[in-house]
From Swiss-Prot:
Domain BUB1 N-terminal, chain residue ranges per copy: 56-218
Organism, scientific name: Schizosaccharomyces pombe (strain 972 / ATCC 24843)
Gene3D superfamilies found in the cross-reference section: 1.25.40.430
Subunit: Component of the mitotic checkpoint complex (MCC) which consists of mad2, mad3, bub3 and slp1/cdc20. Interacts with the chromosome passenger complex subunits ark1 and bir1.
Subcellular location: Nucleus; Chromosome, Centromere, Kinetochore
Predominant location: nucleus
Keywords, sorted A to Z: Cell cycle, Cell division, Centromere, Chromosome, Kinetochore, Mitosis, Nucleus
UniProt GO MF annotations: anaphase-promoting complex binding; ubiquitin ligase inhibitor activity
Transmembrane domains' residue ranges: none
Gene name of the record: mad3
Compositional bias per record (Basic and acidic residues), positions renumbered to this chain: 42-63
Any GO BP annotation: negative regulation of mitotic metaphase/anaphase transition
Protein name per its UniProtKB record: Mitotic spindle checkpoint component mad3
Length: 310
């Protein structure tokens, strides 16, 4: 056994262990040295000032990032810095959700990043804070973001599967299959793993699906959010509610009918949900017919002729 290198800065796990309950899980994991550094901070004025100085440095880089060949990387570095210094995730101090919102909206109409997996991964980080992820995935499909990436279909299908909606999860995978989601070998492996779980946990629906004469709905035109929300789920609801832009006359800013232009921010949703308390004495509640949820619209995908020929 080789001796330990005394010159290296070894991380004592006891330091991390003391604050592990305040660390938000990440698929990519956390840097041990960054965790130890953030866990050992006493939050003195000096430390806070240091963090603020570093944050302003990232903000200045963003202000001048438009002239760069790859402005997205500046945002990625900023997000990584936030996650390293605030492993607990979204807090008032970290501002993580606001940062994710700013980044995702910055490049929605930038064709350079439509199929950039780095940009898609930032959306996948943001979806963890969304009450109804179906709307976010529909928004991405509407703007042709990540439609050639296996990650998009994996994460979308995982959402339905976690709620026991195996057939809808299968629809998502079928879309990915037709789009030849990349890397395709990874996509195939993920789909095989999904079908094994489906057969194990819901064999009846799996059998009825494979024996069905009519093809399953693939447009998600009638996806019912209430149905999904009421389904038994193992995942607790995130803190933030997802809202979407709605144009009263049905036309988007660019003149296209029904164009889904943008998404509401957490701040906007909080203001909308902040109803001031008033006295109900003598008030009458108007009778209204049950409100129907607006359809999510078709699950549109970008069909590239070159991809179709492959």
């Amino acid at each position: 056994m080789e001796p330990l290198d005394a010159g290296k800065n070894w991380v004592h796990m006891d330091v991390i262990e003391q604050s592990k309950e305040n660390i938000e899980p990440r698929k990519a994991g956390h840097s041990a040295s960054a965790l130890a550094k953030s866990s050992s901070r006493n939050h003195t004025e000096k430390e806070v000032a240091g963090l603020q100085k570093e944050r302003m440095g990232h903000e200045r880089k963003i202000e001048t990032s438009e002239s760069l060949d790859d402005p997205l990387q500046v945002w990625i570095d900023y997000i990584k810095w936030t996650l390293d210094n605030f492993p607990q995730g979204e807090t008032k101090t970290s501002g993580l959700v606001t940062l994710l919102e700013r980044c995702t909206r910055e490049f929605v109409r930038n064709p350079l990043y439509k199929d950039d997996v780095r940009y898609l991964r930032i959306w996948m980080q943001y979806v963890n804070y969304i009450d109804e992820p179906v709307e976010l995935f529909s928004f991405l499909a509407h703007h042709h973001i990540g439609q050639e990436s296996s990650i998009f279909y994996e994460e979308y299908a995982n959402y339905f599967e976690s709620r026991g909606l195996f057939q809808k999860a299968d629809e998502v995978y079928q879309k990915g299959k037709r789009m030849k989601a990349k890397p395709f070998l990874r996509f195939q492996q993920k789909y095989q793993q999904f079908t094994h779980r489906w057969l194990e946990f819901a064999p009846q629906s799996f059998s009825s699906n494979t024996n069905s004469v009519n093809p399953l709905q693939t447009t998600f035109e009638s996806t019912n959010i209430q149905e999904i929300s009421q389904s038994r789920t193992k995942i607790s609801k995130p803190k933030f509610k997802f809202s979407v832009y709605s144009d009263a006359d049905g036309s988007g800013k660019d003149g296209q009918p029904g164009t889904w232009q943008t998404l509401g921010t957490v701040d906007q949703r909080r203001k909308e949900n902040n109803i001031s308390a008033t006295s109900w004495v003598g008030e009458k509640l108007p009778l209204k017919s049950p409100r129907k949820l607006d359809p999510l619209g078709k699950f549109q995908v970008h069909c590239d002729e070159e991809v179709s020929k492959e």
